Amino acid sequence: MQFSRDWSRLAATGNLDSILNGWAEDAVMMPPGLPPLQGKDAIKQYVEAAMKLPGFTISWEPVSVHVARSGDLAYMIERNTTTLKDSTGKQVTTYGKVVTVWRKDSTGTWRNVVDMWNDAPPPS
């Protein structure tokens, strides 16, 4: 779970290359209300556009992780928090529940291969 926390901290830096490094080349992102984004190039376009939104920030925290016996595949349940400014300039915060699938690559680095989320109520 620590690599997901570290990745969340990287997202706060705004360094696009560092952020994109967390996804595998063949990753699939499934944002709410959109068709699946296939591959790192499509994910890059989505992330780049999000980062340009006024006041945009995102962070997430793993809730649980389940690793396959093989040790090279895992899934996480996570919560995210996204903030941006609406058309009037008011700051709006939304919350999401997230399922991510991770695969260990040939260098032993965990990479996100499936990233899917939808809306959640605010934390209590």
Model-flagged regions — what are they?
Residues 1-21, 28-124:
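A beta-strand edge to alpha-helix "cap/lid" segment located at domain peripheries
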